[in-house]
Amino acid sequence: MDTSRKIIHIDMDAFYASVEQRDHPEFRGKPLIIGGDPNKRGVVATCSYEARKFGVHSAMPTRQAAKLCPNGIFIHGNMAHYVEVSNQIREIFSRYTDIIEPLSLDEAYLDVTENKKGMKSATMVAREIQQTIYRELGLTASAGVSFNKFIAKIASDFKKPAGITVVAPEEAEAFLEQIPVTKFYGVGKVTAEKLHRLGIETGADLKKWSEWDLIRELHKHGYQLYRHVRGRSNNIVNPHRDRKSVGKETTFEFNVLDNRILEQSLMKFAKKVEERLIKLQKHGKTVVLKLRYSDFTTITKRLTLNEYTNDANQIYQAAALLLRESYKGQDSIRLIGLTVTNLKPVYFENLRLEGL
């Protein structure tokens, strides 16, 4: 395990909402929700910390957010402006390193092992970046510092907002043992439920399981979790990363014959894919359905749409059509997956902050 790298994960605090509160004094100190009209179908893109106190969070339907926070201020937001501010933040990063891997407009990995300013301490680099962002842009950021990307990302969420958490190599396993497994990369709702049934709630619980037992119960997720809880993860920051597809799949606990269950899974996946595409500021044109039967035979079917989309309903309709054409109930399904490919950046004026 290479522990020589110095990696920072910078995550802007409530980015869109913070930009709006900075630019509009009337929003400051108030529950601000980016996501459009709560009387229409939509999802929360992000919200201010004042709104989060009421239980509002990103990807929540705006109608639900309005019930939780009836005095909330709902706005559509200005994506072109957020992109502009994101570029200003990226310029600050580039003063320290060219090895920058953006994950979205509001977060990125930085490898500062050999930074431009010759600073020996990654912690000092992270703190200086935070201070510079606040001084020049009036925004706060949280930072995680460690020797690999997985730990740095978890650490950045540890002391929000405006916090910094440093995890040295010798502290990594103890740090990860205290973390809820729901914070681990790749642990979504389905995997979290499986872990809960197995009595695995924290990294410490996870660490008690052998690699083989985790793989048996969780398949590839088990292998990843076994490595992650021991601090073994990818530590290469890739400045040329460009997401080619966005997808979601699940392996059922029991093989499935019921089309309704398969369609329900596709709808959940479509919503997750929409959320991720919006965060990446991309939309796609090709929908791919993946099915794995009980005998482990795997098929993939694809449909190219007439236009690009990041709309969950359009994605679901395409996937459901592929399912109806491909699956006639002839054998039980072990795994189902949905992916959107053929991606390109969204033009600002067409970006959907509203979802379903």
Curated annotation (Swiss-Prot):
UmuC domain location: 1-188
Class in the EC hierarchy, top level: transferase
Keyword Cytoplasm included in the entry's annotation: yes
EC assignment: 2.7.7.7
Presence of keyword DNA-binding: yes
Subcellular location: Cytoplasm
Source species, domain of life: Bacteria
Site (Substrate discrimination): 16
GO biological process: DNA-templated DNA replication; error-prone translesion synthesis; SOS response
Cofactor (UniProt): Mg(2+)
Gene3D superfamilies assigned to the protein according to its UniProt record, in alphabetical order: 3.30.70.270, 3.40.1170.60, 5' to 3' exonuclease, C-terminal subdomain, DNA polymerase, Y-family, little finger domain
Keywords noted in UniProt: Cytoplasm, DNA damage, DNA repair, DNA replication, DNA-binding, DNA-directed DNA polymerase, Magnesium, Metal-binding, Mutator protein, Nucleotidyltransferase, Transferase
One Gene Ontology molecular-function label: damaged DNA binding
Subunit organization: Monomer.
Stated name of the protein: DNA polymerase IV
